[in-house]
Amino acid sequence: MAFGLDTGVENVVRIKVIGVGGGGNNVVNRMVRSGTRGVDFVAVNTDKQALNVSSATYKIQIGEKLTHGQGAGSDPEVGRKSAEESRAQISKALEDTDMVFITAGMGGGTGTGGAPIVAEIAREQGILTVGVVTKPFGFEGRRRMQQAEKGIEELQGKVDSLVIIPNERLKHATDQKITFANAFEIADDVLRQAVQSISDLIRDTGFINLDFADVTAIMKNAGMAHMGVGRAAGKGKA
């Protein structure tokens, strides 16, 4: 009896990564630049200028009537209403999708308010929905943290699995000195790693190969998930 590795996954599982708001859009741009394959990218924003420079294949300007393309002004309620206004566009972008990653930097307006609506629409369409979000750095202030926590609580009820990356802990997970100038760049890259590591497990054929049924069984209605960030250097690094 012969045993073989399943190489047909890439042609079957349709994965989309949707970046909502500034932080989410940054993750999408990083994944595109890193050459991530087999995934469709969608950028969702209230800020028209941010969408103009996005590397995503699909771009959705939400809340055009409400915000006139000028952003949500760090107000999650504006982000929520903008996503509600554009439900039809979001739903259209999610057609023919098996799994979606919704990524956002929580604490601002568009990502915090819009991500739960995007997740709600995805779940309504029967899509396996995974949220991957960051919590703010301490220096971003109490108000932003409170908004993030409220947004995360709302998002948790709309997704199958939710990965939360507390930016403040990145100080202990990187050799780089975190400064105000590079803090968000490092946070965006960790967010990218989180999304890419899960999608690669499904996409890549190797010694460990998860088929989509395995992933669905693990992540469907799983609630909170945890992610570790590791570093390796030198000969034989893993």
Predicted regions and their residues:
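Tubulin/FtsZ superfamily GTPase core signature
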Residues: 1-238
